[in-house]
Amino acid sequence: MVKAVAVLNSSEGVSGTYLFTQVGVAPTTVNGNISGLKPGLHGFHVHALGDTTNGCMSTGPHYNPAGKEHGAPEDEVRHAGDLGNITVGEDGTASFTITDKQIPLTGPQSIIGRAVVVHADPDDLGKGGHELSKSTGNAGGRIACGIIGLQG
């Protein structure tokens, strides 16, 4: 079993922890808790770079080793890092579990060392018709991020 963690922070008071687990070649499970967000849906993605020298802006685009258009987690055509939305309650917190086969913790397409980013707005899953729908899901600004690192 391989485990990883990302601790998310922002200058706007958002904080959270995402735990990643993968057994063998099975899909990766992500268990997340985050607080300090406005209620509603927020896009969240794995971004290509684990670089936070300029905050979340330096994490690069969505992780997309296959060069596909943006889509929903269940779509065949999607970035590997397209993880959809998290639902934030009225208290500003969210807890969630997802399982995804395109975010491995081992091998040549491992997400270790990359960043996870939470966005200000909902991800339209590539179906919104906006000029940014097919690249970012029109999910708005990057409000919190953390680097995915191996956990002992």
From Swiss-Prot:
Under InterPro entries, the record lists:
SOD-like_Cu/Zn_dom_sf, SOD_Cu/Zn_/chaperone, SOD_Cu/Zn_BS, SOD_Cu_Zn_dom
Keywords on record: Antioxidant, Copper, Cytoplasm, Disulfide bond, Metal-binding, Oxidoreductase, Zinc
The annotation note on the cofactor reads: Binds 1 copper ion per subunit.
Extract the GO molecular function terms from the UniProt entry.
Answer: copper ion binding; superoxide dismutase activity
GO biological process terms held by the UniProt record: removal of superoxide radicals
GO CC annotation: cytoplasm
Task: Please give the catalytic activity noted in the UniProt record.
Answer: 2 superoxide + 2 H(+) = H2O2 + O2
* Pfam families assigned to the protein according to its UniProt record, in alphabetical order: Sod_Cu
The organism's lineage is: Eukaryota, Viridiplantae, Streptophyta, Embryophyta, Tracheophyta
Q: Which residues are listed for Zn(2+) binding in this entry?
A: 62, 70, 79, 82
As for what it does, the entry says: Destroys radicals which are normally produced within the cells and which are toxic to biological systems.
Which Gene3D superfamilies does the record associate with it? Superoxide dismutase, copper/zinc binding domain
Name the enzyme's class. Answer: oxidoreductase
Name of the protein in its database record? Superoxide dismutase [Cu-Zn] 1
Q: Where in the cell is it found?
A: Cytoplasm
Q: Which cysteine-cysteine pairs are annotated as disulfide bonds in the entry?
A: 56-145
**Where, by residue number, does the polypeptide cross the bilayer?**
none
The organism's superkingdom is given as Eukaryota
Give the enzyme's EC designation. 1.15.1.1
Name the protein family. Belongs to the Cu-Zn superoxide dismutase family.
Q: List ligand-binding residues for Cu cation.
A: 45, 47, 62, 119
Assembly and binders: Homodimer.
